């Protein structure tokens, strides 16, 4: 055990120097400068972003005391790494999942404007979910599954 410890002590100066070098090589980000025309265009897209997405209104979460045969639980992994869960009725439209994910995405306006897609993962495979499908959670096979949100 002492050999491992002495080896780590000998390597520590190199690790510290490498991390400082990497930190100094990182590019300093400067804020973008926009002209007045570009800023007007971004304001127009910001106002219409909700209309473009057109997600349905998200109803309240069903009570967990309800019959479990009519409920399904969905776990969603967000792009920032968080995992969130919500219950839906199996008879509800899958489109509500997009509304739920959109409501959980960060508060920054830049993230709110970004388009995303939903992916259901299987061992060794995955399935893209499409907003246009009018299927229910039960019909789509999403009941009690994990869905990932990824940026387009």
Curated annotation (Swiss-Prot):
SUPFAM superfamilies listed in its UniProt record: Ubiquitin-like
Superkingdom of this protein's organism: Eukaryota
Keyword field: Ubl conjugation pathway
Segments for region (Disordered): 32-61
Residue ranges annotated for the UBX domain, each copy included: 67-150
One Pfam family matching this protein: UBX
Record's protein name: Plant UBX domain-containing protein 12
């Amino acid at each position: 055990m002492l050999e491992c410890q002495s080896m780590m002590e000998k390597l520590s100066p190199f690790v510290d120097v490498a991390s400082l070098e990497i930190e100094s090589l990182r590019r300093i980000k400067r804020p973008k400068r926009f002209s007045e025309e570009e800023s007007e265009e971004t304001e127009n897209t910001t106002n219409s972003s909700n209309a473009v997405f057109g997600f349905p209104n998200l109803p309240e979460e069903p009570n967990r005391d309800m019959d479990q045969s009519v409920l399904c639980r969905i776990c969603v992994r967000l792009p920032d790494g968080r995992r969130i869960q919500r219950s839906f009725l199996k008879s509800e439209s899958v489109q509500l999942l997009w509304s739920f994910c959109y409501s959980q995405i960060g508060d920054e306006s830049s993230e709110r404007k970004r388009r995303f897609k939903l992916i259901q993962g299987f061992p060794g495979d995955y399935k893209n979910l499409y907003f246009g499908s009018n299927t229910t959670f039960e019909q789509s096979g999403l009941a009690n599954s994990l869905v990932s949100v990824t940026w387009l």
